[in-house]
Each structure stands twice: as structure tokens, then as C-alpha cells.
């Protein structure tokens, strides 16, 4: 594993951030529309 083969930290942060935003967004959207069941 060379330093070039490693995934940049900012890419990991962006992917994780988008994942969290998507999950939270779907949860609040489901709750707002009345379709979201309590997790």
C-alpha cells in the first residue's frame, strides 16, 4: 500500500457526511409525511 493508493480523508468525510444527511433526511421526511415508523 503506497500513500497514493490510500483514500484521501476528505473523500471519506464527504461520503460519511452524505450518508448521515441522507439517513437523517429520510427519517425526518418519513416522520413529516407520516410514513416513517419509529426506529
Swiss-Prot record:
From the Swiss-Prot or TrEMBL record, give the protein name. Answer: Photosystem II reaction center protein J
Localized where? Answer: Cellular thylakoid membrane
Report the record's Gene Ontology biological process terms: photosynthesis
Keyword annotations from UniProtKB, A to Z: Membrane, Photosynthesis, Photosystem II, Reaction center, Thylakoid, Transmembrane, Transmembrane helix
Query: What is the annotated quaternary arrangement, including any partners?
Result: PSII is composed of 1 copy each of membrane proteins PsbA, PsbB, PsbC, PsbD, PsbE, PsbF, PsbH, PsbI, PsbJ, PsbK, PsbL, PsbM, PsbT, PsbX, PsbY, PsbZ, Psb30/Ycf12, peripheral proteins PsbO, CyanoQ (PsbQ), PsbU, PsbV and a large number of cofactors. It forms dimeric complexes.
Function according to Swiss-Prot or TrEMBL:
One of the components of the core complex of photosystem II (PSII). PSII is a light-driven water:plastoquinone oxidoreductase that uses light energy to abstract electrons from H(2)O, generating O(2) and a proton gradient subsequently used for ATP formation. It consists of a core antenna complex that captures photons, and an electron transfer chain that converts photonic excitation into a charge separation.
Keyword Coiled coil annotated: no
Q: Which InterPro entries match?
A: PSII_PsbJ, PSII_PsbJ_sf
| NCBIfam families in UniProt | PRK02565.1
Q: Which organism is it from?
A: Synechococcus sp. (strain JA-3-3Ab)
Q: Gene3D superfamilies under this entry?
A: 6.10.250.2070
Membrane-spanning regions, if any? Answer: 7-27
What family does this belong to?
Belongs to the PsbJ family.
Q: Name one GO cellular component term.
A: photosystem II reaction center
